[in-house]
Amino acid sequence: IQQKTRELFLMYAQQLAERDADINNKLKIDLGGSINPRKGYQVIDWADGTINCDLNEGIPLKDNSVGVINASHIIQKIRDPLKIISEIHRVLCDGGWVFIEVPSTDGRGAWQDPTHVSYWNENSFWYYTRKEKANYISNTKIRFQEFRINTRLEEHNIAITSAWLCAIKSNERRPHTMNI
């Protein structure tokens, strides 16, 4: 039963987060998604998005207005990792989800693209999901519950890290393990 539950979670987590956003009238945002936009999402990108902006300057949305963010292959192009994670947390509602994919430093993909200016791997997310690591960056406000952080290896020795995180903004009891 546990194995099947895990399989179903991996298959449907993002769809369930999207449905929850719809039910609660929260936005669904695709950061940097103008090349391959996710259906039903508003795109925030440098050009050709629903909202065009420089993500290095922040996310131009109200606090707590977003239910789910898709951030596929974008955060490595943002100069300040702490700022973009802080902005993602700011715009997400309590219990809002972010689904991140980023080239990992465990492979060549993080280094080969000249537009990459920040570098990530599975451990990079600990500073926002684990209290003992958050202390190293004086992080007392950005809190995420970690549901999935893993790395897969693709062709040409390109490793991709996925992080599925849920924003914590209240002391509400939550399912699953919480380390922050």
For the regions a language model picked out, list residue spans one by one.
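Conserved alpha-helix/loop element of class I SAM-dependent methyltransferases that forms part
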Residues: 6-26
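Hydrophobic/aromatic residues located in beta-strands of well-ordered beta-sheets
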Residues: 28, 41, 98-100
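Conserved class I S-adenosyl-L-methionine
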Residues: 26-32
